Regions:
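Glycine- and acidic/polar-rich repeat regions and solenoidal domains
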Residues: 25, 47-63, 79-371
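Parallel beta-helix/beta-solenoid
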Residues: 2-15, 20-22, 26-48, 66-76, ...
Length: 371
């Protein structure tokens, strides 16, 4: 047994609890729909790693079902993931298993790419099977991989009002699939009013997250990577009214509208350089059926009415082939000290920022809409 103890703790003198149960609340089969879990303390699970290419276990999760409500719980001390909205196997159970058996001999990432091709082009899934969950007002912390994880099963879900912190701290693991929230194919999901901090990466939207709305969230101290990472997605995705305070705020692919955000960290994005560029899926609107694949060229980003401060600027783009639009954004002079500070008090968190120059003067600005 390999163990890591807090500094100053001698396991020969202290009491040591070893968690061996793989999950706390997790069905033993798929398709158990419309379950509500409310008001519990759920803790101490030896969960396995949750990749998108195999079963994705969590301390709690629907295991490929529809319409769960998980709210007002404390979810903590999961070896890997807190809440899993992911799949129960590679592919989606009865669909994927109906395909003829085959051995995937492609080297490196080619194996996973071919599996994904088979899965999406020959074994798609529908809204009747999974998704449409409500994950609300939970405190999720001290998980080794992710606070919330899910491939496909998070589609059409509402994730709101959660406090997610201290995820993947202490360098227990390294690699991919680690974040406060990590979702693949989260079509039409809404992530709003969450508070995500002290994680290896705040929010990671990966392959196929189409129609996602990320609104009204507070991110800070996610300083190993970024507050928000959107990887090889084609959009449309909306990122609006968020407060992004970490050193690196945004790393974006394409097809994204960023509106009314306070951005204090670096802003980057551009052409996908992984494995020489990838062809990734896009879908019929508000659906689950792939209608094609396209390269991720970078760009097609729209920036409206954002406030950029401290490290934030629009100067770092990596070969964006698609056009970008900028209008109504305000950038603070890097020489000015806005003293942006997040203060924790007994009744909540407060944002403090010093107004500089002529910011307090009235100024007429053109109304910008998407109409």
């Amino acid at each position: 047994i390999w163990a890591q103890f807090p500094e100053g703790i001698d396991p020969n003198e202290a009491s040591v609890e070893i968690a061996v149960r793989p999950q706390v609340f997790y069905p033993d089969k798929t398709g158990i729909n419309y379950i509500t879990v409310r008001g519990f303390i759920l803790e101490n699970a030896a969960t396995n790693w949750a990749p998108p290419s195999a079963e994705q276990p969590g301390l709690i999760g629907p295991r490929w079902a529809k319409g769960w409500v998980i709210e007002n719980n404390v979810i903590r001390n999961s070896r890997c993931s807190g809440i899993s909205l992911g799949r129960s196997t590679f592919g989606h159970a009865h669909h994927y298993q109906e395909l003829p058996p085959r051995i995937y001999a492609e080297p490196g990432g080619g194996q996973t790419l071919q599996q994904l091709t088979d899965y999406f082009e020959k074994a798609s899934w529908t809204k009747e099977e999974a998704g449409f969950h409500v994950i609300r007002n939970n405190e999720i912390y001290e998980c080794g991989q992710a606070g919330i994880v899910g491939c496909s099963g998070g589609a059409f879900s509402l994730i709101e009002g959660n406090e997610i912190h201290d995820i993947c701290q202490g360098e227990t693991f390294e690699g991919d699939e680690m974040a406060g929230i990590k979702l693949h194919f989260a079509n039409d999901a809404v992530l709003r009013n969450n508070h995500i901090y002290r994680t290896i990466r705040g929010l990671w939207l990966d392959w196929g997250s189409q129609g996602v709305q990320v609104t009204g969230n507070l991110f800070h101290e996610n300083d190993v990577q970024e507050d928000i990472f959107v990887e090889v997605c084609h959009g449309p995705i909306l990122i609006a009214n968020n407060i992004l305070l970490s050193r690196h705020s945004l790393n974006l692919s394409q097809g994204i509208a960023c509106v009314h955000n306070l951005i204090c960290g670096e802003v980057t994005g551009g052409k996908d350089r992984c494995a020489g560029g990838r062809l990734t899926f896009y879908y019929e609107p508000h659906g689950t059926v792939s209608v094609g694949k396209a390269p991720n060229l970078g760009g097609d980003l729209q920036w409206y009415n954002n406030l950029l401060a401290e490290r934030a600027s629009f100067d770092r783009w990596d070969e964006c082939a698609l056009p970008m639009k900028f209008e109504g954004n305000a950038s603070a002079d890097p020489a000015s000290d806005l003293e942006v500070e997040l203060i924790k008090k007994t009744d909540g968190w407060y944002l403090s920022m010093k107004a500089v120059g002529n910011w307090l003067q009235k100024e007429k600005r053109r109304l910008i809409t998407t109409a």
